[in-house]
């Protein structure tokens, strides 16, 4: 098996850190149905990663959904889900609309983001 590149390792670490921050921010609670049983929650992107990396780790672009709401509602009813997000989080929706686009992070930027997220988790100081 091929060894992971340093960039791929950073990407994996940032995925993990951003999920941890989102779980904490949203109190391990599905933002759609309110389920809070400590299991089956997922970090979900508003603007999909496939639309570009610019917002992949932007915490404003993420929310916690339970497994059911993520797969059976968010992905199957994108218009309804988008309307819900815009009504529920209008400031975040506006921010995302203004900041979407294609962007390629440098390795230094990835390292800086990783350090910032690690520090936020360590000190329980979130800047959402």
For the regions a protein language model found, what residue spans apply to each?
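Histidine-centered nuclease catalytic patch
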Residues: 31-64, 73
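A boundary/linker detector
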Residues: 1-17, 36-37, 95-128
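Short amphipathic alpha-helical segments with coiled-coil-like heptad repeat character
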Residues: 30, 89-97
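Short, flexible, mixed-charge glycine/proline-rich loop motifs
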Residues: 17-26, 55-59
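Short, surface-exposed loop/turn motifs that are enriched in glycine and acidic residues
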Residues: 7-12, 19, 52-55, 71
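Short acidic/histidine-centered micro-motifs embedded in hydrophobic/aromatic stretches
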Residues: 49, 84, 99
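Short Cys/His-centered divalent metal-binding micro-motifs
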Residues: 35-38, 62-86, 90
């Amino acid at each position: 098996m091929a060894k992971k590149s340093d960039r791929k390792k950073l990407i994996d670490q940032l995925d993990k850190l951003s999920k941890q921050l989102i779980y904490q921010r949203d109190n391990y609670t599905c933002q759609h149905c309110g389920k809070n049983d400590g299991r089956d929650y997922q970090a979900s992107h508003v603007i999909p990663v496939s639309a570009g990396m610019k917002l992949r780790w932007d915490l404003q672009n993420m929310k916690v959904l339970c497994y059911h709401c993520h797969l059976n509602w968010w992905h199957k009813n994108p218009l309804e889900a988008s309307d819900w997000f815009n009504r529920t989080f209008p400031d975040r929706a506006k921010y995302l609309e203004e900041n979407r686009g294609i962007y390629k992070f440098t390795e230094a930027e990835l390292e800086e983001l990783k350090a910032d997220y690690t520090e936020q988790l360590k000190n329980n100081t979130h800047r959402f």
